[in-house]
């Protein structure tokens, strides 16, 4: 074998190794949505206040708790009290599958998530479509407590850039005390800021036609959540929040977040 052929073989082998052992970033990334993929606020004729409620200071937050029960194989029930409005003292969080529920079943965890009441079931005896007193439900929102906090109670700032009609109009930071934080927690904090500063959701509608929040991880993978309700005259909070049931977490030090909004007259 001559020298040039030998070098070519070495390069080919090296390339094959890269293909086999390098993670395929593109395959795991969620492409940016096309305009047709996004929900449009003008096509929602219900009360936007029901969406606003999910992100306007109404969320479950607890530290160092353990599950005390379950209803189905893929959920966990916690003794968490609503210290603000006294609406509940039990919280059920539903996860994507049984394996994910088992992962956190006997762990000391922190819980942070948006919650709902209608169609929240803790047993087969609960009435369909009714509110179960003293109880609330959510999806995901779980992180292990041990070793997941910064020293001396320090907080991590996470930068969020907002683009309106493709132009960066504002940037702001939200804070978390967790090293590995759920995307849900950061989403809630981002939307809460935008509700207060940009009127993201009003009682009847929104000044924005479309919106999505995009997470960019350190390895280049991306994913996003649609920020507007589906078309129609009814908004199902439970169905909307189901997007968090995979309990997706990100590294708070490296994650980048973008919010993309289009105005109705843009």
From Swiss-Prot:
The keyword Signal belongs to this UniProt entry's keyword annotation: yes
Gene Ontology CC annotations of this record: extracellular region
Q: Which cofactor does it need?
A: Zn(2+)
Cite the binding residues for Zn(2+) 2: 74, 98, 107, 146
Q: What is the effect of changing residue 74 to A?
A: About 30% loss of T-cell stimulation
Q: Report the GO molecular function annotations.
A: metal ion binding; toxin activity
Q: Which residues hold Zn(2+) 1?
A: 36, 110, 145, 149
- Effect of mutating residue 145 to A: Complete loss of emetic activity
Disulfide pairings: 120-137
Where in or outside the cell it occurs: the entry states:
Secreted
Question: What does the record say about how the cofactor binds?
Answer: Possesses two zinc-binding sites. The zinc ion is necessary for the toxin interaction with MHC class II.
Q: Which domain of life is it from?
A: Bacteria
Signal peptide interval: 1-27
Give the InterPro entries listed for this entry: Enterotoxin, Staph/Strept_toxin_CS, Staph_tox_OB, SuperAg_toxin_C, Superantigen_bac, Toxin_b-grasp_Staph/Strep, Toxin_bac
Q: Keywords, A to Z?
A: Disulfide bond, Enterotoxin, Metal-binding, Secreted, Signal, Superantigen, Toxin, Virulence, Zinc
The UniProt subunit note reads as follows: Interacts with host MHC class II molecules composed of alpha/HLA-DRA and beta/HLA-DRB1 chains.
Function, as annotated, reads: Staphylococcal enterotoxin that activates the host immune system by binding as unprocessed molecules to major histocompatibility (MHC) complex class II and T-cell receptor (TCR) molecules. In turn, this ternary complex activates a large number of T-lymphocytes initiating a systemic release of pro-inflammatory cytokines. Also causes the intoxication staphylococcal food poisoning syndrome.
Its family?
Answer: Belongs to the staphylococcal/streptococcal toxin family.
- Protein name per its UniProtKB record: Enterotoxin type C-2
- Gene source species: Staphylococcus aureus
Q: What is the lineage of its organism?
A: Bacteria, Bacillati, Bacillota, Bacilli, Bacillales
State the encoding gene: entC2
